[in-house]
Amino acid sequence: MPQSPEQPDVSSTVSYNRVMLKISGEALMGTQGFGLHPPTVRRIAEEVKSVHDLGVEICMVIGGGNIFRGLSGSAQGMERTTADYMGMLATVMNALGMQSALEDLGVFTRVISAIRMDEVAEPYIRRRAVRHLEKKRVCIFAAGTGNPYFTTDTAATLRANEMNCEAIFMGKNGVDGVYDKDPKTNEDAKRYDSVSYDDVLAKRLKVMDASAIALARDNNLPLIVFGLDEPGGFRGVLAGEGTYTKVHG
């Protein structure tokens, strides 16, 4: 298939074989204030397909904040454990929506849930998930770690390590990397080209929660933060092109 101007042929320069793509649930909302926006879900699925077409094995974790966020529920008086489980179920809904969009594009996809719900998703079995990746199926890991008090950032880092991913790619909406302060409210915010995990923790930069950062650091797992709303952004960043921040040891 010929490449569009926004998606140059980078197949010869991509050095990754297996990666984790982490996106927030809010990324699926589009211009809506809640839920899934099907055209937006399809656009992101097309980004994933463009990388899958290069032969890269792809894991995904999608947050659930577009439907329900456990911390928000807890802050409003809901029991924390129950709120977190509700948030995990929201991630399953998002995973099923993304699976539908990917398979509509011809990409075989498996939703793998940390909480058993056999009618709609496979249970998490590491060796089976690895085999899916080897068969070039996209694996979407849902329901977080299956435990309350752990974020989907931590789940993404955990699964990336278990699946032997070479890096985590964090697709952000409206932000193209890691900044020293919020670029949406500070015009003088400066973007880092690269930053260490220790600096992220020490400076409390908003990348991932501290548990996820520490887990990535301790296993020497690089993290690339880029803008998901840029057409061809995921594919380009895999080739070292475009704007992004690399977080490393």
From Swiss-Prot:
Where does this protein reside within or beyond the cell? Cytoplasm
Entry's Gene Ontology molecular function annotations:
ATP binding; UMP kinase activity
Q: Which UniProt keywords apply?
A: Allosteric enzyme, ATP-binding, Cytoplasm, Kinase, Nucleotide-binding, Pyrimidine biosynthesis, Transferase
Q: What is this enzyme's class at the first EC digit?
A: transferase
Listed GO CC annotations = cytoplasm
What pathway, per the record?
Answer: Pyrimidine metabolism; CTP biosynthesis via de novo pathway; UDP from UMP (UMPK route): step 1/1
Q: Which residues bind ATP?
A: K22, I23, S24, G25, G65, R69, N173, Y179, D182
Q: What is its main location?
A: cytoplasm
Q: Does the keyword Cytoplasm apply?
A: yes
- Residue spans making up a coiled coil are none
The biological process GO terms on file are: 'de novo' CTP biosynthetic process; UDP biosynthetic process
Annotated catalysed reactions: UMP + ATP = UDP + ADP
Q: Which NCBIfam families match?
A: pyrH_bact (TIGR02075)
Homology family: Belongs to the UMP kinase family.
Subunit arrangement? Homohexamer.
What is this protein called in UniProt?
Uridylate kinase
* Organism whose genome encodes this protein: Ruegeria sp. (strain TM1040)
Q: Encoded by which gene?
A: pyrH
